[in-house]
Structures are given as structure tokens and as C-alpha cells.
Amino acid sequence: MILRAEHLVKTYKKRSVVKGISVEVNQGEIVGLLGPNGAGKTTSFYMIVGLVKPNSGNIYLDDMNITDFPMYKRAQQGIGYLAQEASVFRKLSIEDNILSVLQLTKLSKAEQIIKMESLIDEFGLEHIRTNRGDLLSGGERRRTEIARCLATDPKFILLDEPFAGVDPVAVEDIQRIVAQLKNKNIGILITDHNVQETLAITDKTYLMFEGGILKAGIPEELVEDEMVRRVYLGQNFELRKKKLEF
């Protein structure tokens, strides 16, 4: 499957924030959407998520036009979303956080338990499975949120600032999890201010500037582009690609 946005435009009070951008994410691919503050990347990301309605342009899941779908309908079609803000239920344990989503599926009670156990094991949450959401570290919270998102077997996951509020020691853990999602043939779209951490794991990246796409390509191509360095990365930026083991 392919998730694609075509010619998205967004204006606020006659000010053009997004000027006809197009973005494409395939299953089994990690795609970055980056840019300096004010470039329009967050607005573009939110249009793809379904939080903001474009003035023109369309969003497709394969050949299905989902531009007017509310977020819950996009979720039903296999598009998961993880917000930057904490979304775990603070007073529920990790177990109950995951079960709360599984209970909305068509799985039987027994199948829900099996799925929960599988996700807890996969994301290394066994030792804290009974801990409440408000007692988790940033990295533990992110792992729980991603595990809960996978409870509905999404085809795509849209990650808003996945490295925000995460200790440096946990960044590689999150990167490894995102790589695992790719191996499950899930398409990933990431927007984040942490450029190095994002470019280290993306297959391709769209770099926005002043409402448009300045450059799109593999991270190595972006880093070598003089305009990209001048307006965003800086002349001393060095790409550190990661080969993550899991």
C-alpha cells in the first residue's frame, strides 16, 4: 500500500503556510518530514494525520481518497498516529493501556490476552507491565505508546516528534523500534526537530522550506546539498547513519 499526499495547500488569513507539497510513503519504508521552524512541516504533517483540513489537494491510501476522513476513519483504514504529547492513560498499567485498545478490536477475550502478551514481550515491557502510565520514563512511555498503536495492526504509523522528551540513552532504543516496525512492513512517517536522530534511520526525507519542498531524497543526498546546508543543516553537519541490531 501507498500513503500519499498530493499538492496540499494550507492558508491562514491569506498567508500561505503550505504551498502545494506532495509526499509519499510506502509500506516498509521510513520517511522523514523535516524543516526549520515556520517551514510548514507541522501543518503538512497534521493534514496527513487528519488534524488539519487542507484548502486544496488530496490524501490517498492507494486509490482511496481519504482527505475528508476523520482520524478514527483513517485509523480504521490502517493509519496509526502517535502524538508528541503523552498519550498513555496515566492511571492505567501498561497491561491495561494495551488492553484498552485491544478491547475495541474484533478479537476474542483470549485473543486479546495473547496479543497483549506478545506486545509486552516484543517491546521489553515485561518487568514494568504492572506500572502505571504516570510512573514511566520517557523511553518506557514511548515504547508503551508504540506497542498500544500496534494493537490494531496498522499499515502506516505517523510519528510526531518521537524523540522529544526522551533521554539520550533511550533514543537508540526508539530508533531500533522504528526499524523493527519497518521490518514488519509498516510504513513510517516521522516529523521531528531532532535532525540527526531522524536522518540516521530514514530511507528518504522531504525537507521543507518556506511552505514548499526544498529537497527530497535519501539522507546522503540532502546532506551533500549546499542549499540544504545553508538554510537548515549548517556547514558542519555530519550524517551518522545507524545499522541497528535487534
Task: Enumerate the predicted regions with their spans.
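Helix-to-loop junction immediately C-terminal to a conserved catalytic motif
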Residues: 49
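Conserved ABC ATPase "signature" region
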Residues: 110-128, 175-179
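Conserved catalytic motifs of ABC-family nucleotide-binding domains
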Residues: 153
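Catalytic Walker B motif of ABC-type/P-loop ATPase nucleotide-binding domains
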Residues: 157-161
